[in-house]
A protein has these predicted regions:
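Short, surface-exposed ligand-recognition loops at beta-strand->loop->(often short) alpha-helix junctions
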Residues: 12-18, 31-32, 102-108, 236-243
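Glycine-rich, small/acidic residue-mixed loop/short-helix segments
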Residues: 179, 201-207, 211-217, 221-303
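Residue-level signal for inorganic ion chemistry
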Residues: 15, 65, 102-104, 152, ...
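Short, solvent-exposed amphipathic alpha-helical segments in soluble enzyme
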Residues: 25-31, 79-84, 165-169, 224, ...
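Acidic, low-complexity central loop/insert segments
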Residues: 2-5, 9-10, 55, 59-186
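Anionic-ligand-binding alpha/beta catalytic cores of soluble enzymes and soluble regulatory domains
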Residues: 145-233
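Acidic, proline/glycine-enriched N-terminal capping motif
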Residues: 1-53, 57-60
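Short amphipathic beta-strand starts and helix->beta connectors
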Residues: 39-53, 83-86, 131-139, 250-254
Length: 303
């Protein structure tokens, strides 16, 4: 397996009302998750547009929110606008924690040797809290690259000891991003899809339609009932495709590209441009490939 440091920020929620409060803020059904457990979740505007994407970890004594680097402070400000009488405390723990992603095993299997070093049991719960010497680790089976890997959260003071224990080849974050794009997995921050609807950029799997009210829920329910979004997530294949470019056809805006890895880029594209269509992307030509049959549903699970 390979090891990659994930640029991160994070929040910790404590207090007796933490679960009810967070349940009303996000798209996933956190109350249905096991303890310990993890759900991917979106935080939407009242218009249903994506503001934040996070992995939410449910632990016995707190809730841990893992976000991309630089996102925690803004989400903390949002929370504090809504905390009135709720008994909830929000703590930014970005500076004390590190996150590693262990990935790249053939066939997507978890290395038993690595799992044993971490005291992680692959045949048991997806998310586990383990003790290794003086270290307490939060570990979850997690698909960032099209195959299952392990996401490991550790206190910074134990990071060097963990790296020495694992003794794995390190890969840069860009390698994880390239694998993600090729696997057709959307990342709203890296791909520039913040401000868009989840259903239009491959993130509907992070939306639960079984839970109660939350910010943006009315729009999500309306879209589920009518199914009338105008865009979908696709993969474009060509040569030297640019990142974060507005796409036009016949003088009309038809979508936007996400993060490019050269010959492949994900794009939010109007539905009338069907699978196999050819599209001009900057100075290059690209072919549209529908992702509806290739996206791995286990990459997102909102309960």
């Amino acid at each position: 397996m390979y090891l990659t440091h994930i640029p991160s920020s994070s929040l910790r929620l404590t207090g007796p009302d933490r679960l009810d409060f967070l349940q009303g803020q996000m798209t996933a059904h956190l109350k249905a998750a096991p303890t310990p457990g993890r759900v991917p979740a979106l935080f939407l505007s009242v218009k249903g547009q994506i503001e934040f994407f996070a992995q939410i970890y449910k632990r016995p004594d707190d809730l841990y929110l893992h976000l991309a680097a630089g996102q925690a402070e803004a989400l903390e400000r949002r929370f504090k606008k809504y905390i009135i009488f709720d008994q909830v405390e929000v703590q930014n723990v970005s500076s004390v924690l590190s996150t590693l992603h262990l990935w790249g095993e053939m066939g997507g299997e978890i290395s038993l040797e690595v799992a044993q070093k971490l005291n992680y049991s692959p045949e048991e719960a997806e998310t586990q809290i383990t003790d290794v010497g003086e270290m307490t680790l939060l570990i979850s089976r997690f698909n960032r690259t099209g195959q299952s890997g392990l996401e490991v959260h550790v206190l910074n003071k134990h990071l060097d000891a963990l790296l020495e224990l694992l003794a794995l080849e390190e890969k840069p974050y860009s390698a994880v991003q390239e694998a993600r794009v090729r696997a057709g997995i959307s990342d709203p921050l890296e791909d520039g899809f913040l401000g868009d609807l989840p259903q239009e950029c491959g993130l509907e799997g992070a939306v639960s339609y079984k839970k109660g009210c939350y910010i943006g829920q009315e729009i999500m329910a309306r879209l589920e009932a009518r199914g009338n979004t105008r865009h979908r997530l696709v993969r474009l294949e060509g040569q030297n495709l640019p990142s974060h470019l507005e796409l036009e056809q016949g003088g009309k805006k038809v979508g936007q590209t996400g993060l490019s890895v050269g010959n492949v880029v994900l794009a939010r594209l109007r539905k009338e441009l069907e699978d196999g269509a050819t599209l001009e992307v900057g100075s290059s030509s690209a072919t549209v490939h529908d992702l509806s049959s290739t996206l791995n549903p286990s990459a997102l699970r909102a309960f």
